[in-house]
Design a protein with these regions (language model features):
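Short, structured motif recognition centered on aromatic/hydrophobic residues
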Residues: 43-51, 81-82
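Acidic, glycine/proline-rich low-complexity segments that act as flexible tails and inter-domain linkers
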Residues: 1-43, 55, 62-66, 70, ...
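Winged helix-turn-helix DNA-binding recognition segment
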Residues: 73-77
Length: 120
């Protein structure tokens, strides 16, 4: 029983991107780089762009967006990242990421589209 509880707890923590669990169990550091080459905000914005470009799932996009906000990025800067990666990542990747990034910014874009009388 103990083993089942352990794997379930690890899976739960991985699903919510528990940074300590990821570091302890997988040996991955999710900390923002401290090399001095990029400030934490810029590094977090680059990570958001990378998450969008590779088609990351919702939990990763929301996590990355939340980290960028915590590092001092604004909603406008994060939106700018989406626009900047569009030509390279493709419109489909960006459009697919928008609802999850918007949710992390506290904006329900899907409801807003439904409420728009002019449509999308």
């Amino acid at each position: 029983m103990g083993q089942a509880v352990r794997f379930q707890e690890v899976l739960r923590k991985l699903a919510i991107i528990d940074e300590r669990c990821v570091a302890d169990q997988a040996g991955l550091s999710l900390a923002l780089p401290t090399s001095g080459l990029l400030d934490p905000k810029t590094a977090a914005l680059v990570q958001v762009g990378a998450l969008v470009a590779i088609g990351s799932p919702a939990v990763c996009l929301e996590w990355g967006t939340t980290r960028a906000l915590a590092a001092g990025a604004t909603a406008d800067e994060i939106t700018g990242v989406l626009l900047a990666v569009g030509p390279e990542a493709g419109l489909g990747r960006v459009a697919g990421a928008v609802p999850d990034v918007a949710a992390a910014l506290g904006y329900d874009v899907e409801t807003a589209l439904l409420e728009d009388p002019d449509g999308p």
